[in-house]
């Protein structure tokens, strides 16, 4: 049974596709020089689909309690998802880390991009693949 296929199917796409780019809408030619628009990250369609599938998985598989990702991380003494050793964690923890990064994007622009660029998301999805065997 492939419980995590909705998420793990994105592995090849996330490895090959450009994840997106930073957008900076500020211009040097602003006549007043007083307007400022914070930079933001625009994700590729493949990453946007992955994000949508994470939320869909959380909705259709409530037994993983992904909405309580912070509590799951705290209960497992995970203070930094980027420093945690995924090879020793169960599916609940891996899914909590994935949701933590997706939700964290709302508070820190580019948080998901960091997880993708540094291979953390790839490692977590590979761990879910291992756990399915």
What role is predicted for each listed range?
Residues 7-11, 115:
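Eukaryote-skewed repeat-based solenoidal scaffolds used as protein-protein interaction platforms
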Residues 18-37, 41, 59-64, 82-88, ...:
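Charged, low-complexity interaction regions
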Residues 60, 66-72, 120-128:
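Repeat-associated, polar segments at repeat-unit boundaries in modular proteins
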């Amino acid at each position: 049974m492939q419980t995590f296929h909705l998420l793990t199917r994105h592995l090849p796409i996330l490895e090959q596709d450009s994840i997106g780019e930073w957008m900076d809408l500020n211009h040097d030619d602003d006549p007043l020089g007083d307007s400022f628009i914070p930079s933001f990250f625009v994700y590729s369609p493949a990453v946007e689909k992955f994000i949508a599938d994470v939320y869909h998985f959380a909705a259709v598989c409530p037994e993983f309690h992904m909405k309580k990702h912070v509590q799951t991380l705290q209960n497992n003494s995970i203070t930094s998802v980027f420093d945690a050793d995924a090879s020793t964690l169960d599916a609940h923890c891996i899914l909590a880390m994935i949701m933590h990064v997706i939700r964290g994007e709302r508070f820190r622009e580019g948080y998901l991009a960091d997880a993708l660029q540094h291979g953390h998301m790839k490692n977590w999805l590979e761990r879910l693949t291992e756990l399915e065997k």
